[in-house]
Amino acid sequence: MAERKYFGTDGVRGKVGSYPITPDFVLKLGWAAGKVLATQGTGKVLIGKDTRISGYMLESALEAGLAAAGLSAAFTGPMPTPAIAYLTRTFRSEAGIVISASHNPFYDNGIKFFSAQGTKLPDDVEEAIEAMLEQPMDCVESAKLGRASRINDAAGRYIEFCKSTFPAHLSLDKYKIVVDCANGATYHIAPNVMRELGAEVIEIGTQPDGMNINENCGATDIKALQNQVLETKADIGLAYDGDGDRLIMVDHFGNKVDGDQILFIIAREALRSGNLKGGVVGTLMSNMSLELALKQLGIPFVRANVGDRYVLEKMQEYNWILGGENSGHIIIADKNTTGDGVIASLAVLAAMVQHKLSLNELASAVKLFPQVLINVRFAGGANPLESDAVKAVATEVEKQLAGKGRILLRKSGTEPLIRVMVECEDAELAQLSAEKIAEAVRSN
């Protein structure tokens, strides 16, 4: 695979106003993508965004670039990333484009592409777009320029799709649910889905102003949700991130229920109903307790690299339908082609209603081992993980943990950091072990 200049694991991302998230680059990116995608299909691209103020600027730039290449753009307005994956398929679009930086602050943004099938673009297509970016920009003749249109009922279409994944014989009419939409793309989706299925809904994080996305709310900061669940005596709390592809839950005691526990609940329910189709894909960061709990049920488990892209690739490799990350990306491939926070929450709620059990009771089968994560900054140059001294300390720690835990050492893909993770039933041993390895990395 060729070295990427612009595309990371989740498209093109960065700080707004700094290259490559500038109007001129995004214009060129739209043109390059248009040139590559215009070779076949409908000549139509779907564009959605989250609630960042910069989304207006970037969608205009994308539209101009696509039109210059001869492709038409249809805009959905603020819409969760998984909604764009779904709508790209139903509108038979050539591709879907999401303008979002997911769980990042408002001053970041990004451009992510979906194929006509609603999956991440194949590597060869991304490489072709990168190659086209190196060419001088031109413009098709006037009669062949692309047009722009707006899809006014996009939200309603996606709401109905989400509801269709919830069993028709079940209802949420006995549940009080707090929904935290991170002032992001699910603000007009998730509360309506839950209400239309019968729930009493209390909303937080549903007043986006362009700059408050993910700010002290959502899946990356659940304190406000925990407080609201306890204050209102709600049955459950749901937290999505800025673009709606992550879910973190809170039980009625205010306890966090993370992606590993959510994945287990959905896997166990799929096993009971005969819909599991194979095993479950986690990541290198998935808690060891998830692996052990699945093993007790006889459910196979494999680990992919961190990132929902790699989880999906591993799922496709094994032809399995369920995978996810502890951060809350949950992919249920027989329902949608990417991580979908709203659909994952409905899968857990269905299990609660079906068995008349609380979230706390459902999640209790996975007692998460303490995880200690230390980020060690290094000055660049040689990778400290290649050092014999660091390898020796890591081997020594692994022997001490011997079946009671595990270590994971990896270099960040975006910053000069070594991430040291130690997981163990004994929290004190995990802390000491992580500090020992981190010190070896610093001293290298």
Curated annotation (Swiss-Prot):
EC number(s) on file: 5.4.2.10
Xref: SUPFAM superfamilies: Phosphoglucomutase, C-terminal domain, Phosphoglucomutase, first 3 domains
TM region(s), chain numbering: none
Cofactor: Mg(2+)
Free-text cofactor note: Binds 1 Mg(2+) ion per subunit.
Substrates-to-products reaction catalysed: alpha-D-glucosamine 1-phosphate = D-glucosamine 6-phosphate
CDD domains given in the database record: GlmM (cd05802)
Modified residues (Phosphoserine): 102
Keywords of the record: Isomerase, Magnesium, Metal-binding, Phosphoprotein
Source taxon at top rank: Bacteria
GO terms under cellular component: cytosol
Record GO biological process: carbohydrate metabolic process; peptidoglycan biosynthetic process; UDP-N-acetylglucosamine biosynthetic process
Post-translational modification: Activated by phosphorylation.
NCBIfam families registered for this protein in UniProt: glmM, PRK10887.1
Function: Catalyzes the conversion of glucosamine-6-phosphate to glucosamine-1-phosphate.
PANTHER family per the UniProt record, alphabetical: PHOSPHOGLUCOMUTASE (ALPHA-D-GLUCOSE-1,6-BISPHOSPHATE-DEPENDENT) (PTHR42946:SF1), PHOSPHOHEXOSE MUTASE (PTHR42946)
Name of the protein in its database record: Phosphoglucosamine mutase
Organism: Histophilus somni (strain 2336)
